């Protein structure tokens, strides 16, 4: 019995050691010389592809700043590997260590906080409706009997269903595997509306073939804090990321990045997203925090 108990204790200690090592991002990248950034193909001006394996955007720049400080902590130059993620696989890829830092368009909510950690909110988003400019739709109440697009694995799916129950409106959900696919459903006429974060809608409209053909309408369906995601229970890396973002907020650098990506022309077509920072976003910059979206709903 004593032998079995000792063996069990050793096994548990060994497992704990592996876990500690697995969640120590600074030690991991120092050993490998590589840091893996989770990126999105079409998350508006937050994170998107330029083609040929290149990615850019508001969150990409913030993550690059964090990685610069990660290099200082690791004491070496790191190779940055881009790992495209989707709304469905982003959390599992952070959990299993494939992705070290996810720089897309992820909503921080209480359910996700059980599985991953979030750095301070970089902007507070409002979920809205995009339609064709020729459409008469101005509210979710007018979506009865219509095909409504959204992206698989996003909080907008829950938002749609919640509003459907609350309003008694009966519409058919059609899903894109990523935001560009969801927008294509609207663009091609297979859906009459696309429900998603306003910045993502604005970004996809801005980079579409004919931006004037689309508009964002309707009431705010949900208010959601968007943040960069990292592995849970990694105190050292979380502090490094928090300190980096807090300094960017304090210095005004993050406001300048917002202007660069959401107000000024952006590559590759030099189009403007034209999406001003909300008062809630500015409040998050003034008082950095990692509160989940449920806290915003209480206000």
Where do the PLM segments sit?
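Ligand-binding clefts/hinges and TM-proximal coupling segments of bilobed small-molecule sensing domains
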Residues: 30, 155-174, 212-214, 246-299
């Amino acid at each position: 019995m004593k032998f079995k108990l000792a063996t069990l204790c050793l096994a548990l200690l060994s497992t704990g050691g592996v876990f500690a090592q697995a969640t120590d991002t600074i030690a991991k990248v120092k050993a490998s010389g590589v840091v893996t950034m989770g990126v999105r193909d079409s998350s508006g001006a937050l994170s998107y592809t330029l083609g040929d394996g290149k990615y850019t955007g508001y969150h990409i720049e913030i993550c690059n700043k964090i990685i610069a400080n990660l290099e200082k902590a690791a004491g070496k130059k790191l190779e940055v590997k881009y790992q495209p993620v989707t709304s469905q696989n982003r959390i599992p890829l952070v959990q299993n260590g494939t992705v070290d830092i996810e720089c897309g368009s992820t909503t921080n909510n209480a359910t996700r906080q059980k599985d991953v950690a979030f750095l301070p909110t970089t902007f507070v988003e409002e979920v809205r409706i995009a339609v064709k400019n020729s459409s008469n739709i101005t509210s979710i109440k007018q979506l009865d009997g219509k095909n409504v697009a959204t992206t698989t694995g996003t909080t907008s799916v829950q938002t749609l269903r919640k509003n459907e129950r609350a309003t008694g409106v009966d519409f058919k959900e059609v899903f894109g595997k990523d935001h560009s696919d969801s927008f294509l459903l609207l663009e091609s006429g297979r859906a009459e509306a696309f429900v998603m974060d306003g910045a993502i809608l604005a970004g996809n409209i801005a980079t579409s073939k004919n931006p004037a053909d689309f508009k964002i309408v309707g009431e705010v369906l949900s208010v959601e804090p968007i943040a960069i995601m990292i592995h849970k229970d990694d105190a050292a890396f979380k502090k490094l990321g928090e300190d980096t973002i807090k300094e960017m907020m304090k210095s005004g650098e993050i406001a300048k990045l917002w202007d660069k990506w959401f107000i000024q022309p952006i590559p590759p077509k030099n189009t403007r997203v034209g999406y001003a920072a909300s008062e809630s976003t500015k409040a998050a910059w003034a008082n950095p925090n990692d509160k989940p979206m449920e806290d915003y709903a209480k206000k």
